[in-house]
Design a protein with these regions (language model features):
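Extracytoplasmic
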Residues: 7-47, 59-63, 148-149
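A generic transmembrane-helix signature of 12-TM secondary carrier transporters
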Residues: 16, 80, 84-87, 102-103, ...
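Hydrophobic core of transmembrane alpha-helices in multi-pass small-molecule transporters
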Residues: 17, 86, 97-113
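Short hydrophobic/small-residue motifs within alpha-helical transmembrane segments
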Residues: 52-57, 142-144
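Conserved MFS/SLC helix-loop-helix module at the cytosolic interface between two early adjacent transmembrane helices
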Residues: 58-97
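Cytoplasmic helix-loop-helix junction between adjacent transmembrane helices
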Residues: 103-139
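Helix-loop-helix hairpin linking two adjacent transmembrane segments in secondary transporters
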Residues: 136-184
Length: 184
């Protein structure tokens, strides 16, 4: 592996940590706090994850089109901003319905800059060890979920779920900075 390959792999690890690690694998830590705050069942809040994942799948269908028709960096910048802002905006939702709407937006945006884009980057930069590189990058979804879930739980306990969503929105965007700023 060359230095450039390692750099691309690190970028992909950050991208997967942001999209799958934060969007999906650590989402459950919010369910009880949000449900109690809104006076609804946890199932109503967990539906946000289902909606996000469905929108993620749809967004992934548009990845190649956007990357082909637009500048790569601008696409990543645009959709990582949308993802970060929509995640932070979950903290100001007055009820669960608005969380559903934001879940569509954040799911779609991460779909565009998520798994499909990561595999495209790996396939474009690696001529050998493609499977290994893909496995390492995708492994960061679980690593991020395992590390961030207790961190987010602690954050929710200390600052409340609303402020935690703002912090997570910022983190979601920050994890995309290596992709935006590096010469990938």
């Amino acid at each position: 592996m060359t230095k450039k390959n390692i750099g691309v792999l690190l970028v992909c690890c950050c991208m997967v940590a942001s999209t799958i690690g934060i969007l999906t694998n650590s989402a459950g830590v919010f369910f009880t706090s949000v449900a109690d705050s809104f006076g609804v069942g946890r199932g109503s809040v967990s539906l946000t994850l289902t909606i996000s994942n469905m929108a993620y799948a749809v967004g992934g269908l548009f990845t190649v089109k956007w990357i082909r028709n637009a500048n790569f960096k601008k696409t990543v910048l645009l959709f990582s901003c949308i993802y970060g802002i929509s995640t932070a905006a979950l903290g100001i939702c007055p009820d669960v319905f608005f969380m559903y709407v934001l879940s569509v937006i954040r799911g779609f945006s991460t779909g565009v800059i998520g798994m499909v884009l990561v595999t495209i980057l790996i396939n474009n930069h690696f001529t050998s060890n493609v499977g290994l590189a893909t496995s390492i990058a995708l492994g960061f979804s679980g690593i991020a979920g395992a590390i961030l879930s207790p961190v987010f739980t602690s954050l929710i306990q200390s600052t409340g779920w609303r402020m935690s969503y703002v912090c997570i929105g910022i983190l979601s965007f920050v994890l995309y900075l290596p992709c935006i700023l590096s010469p990938v």
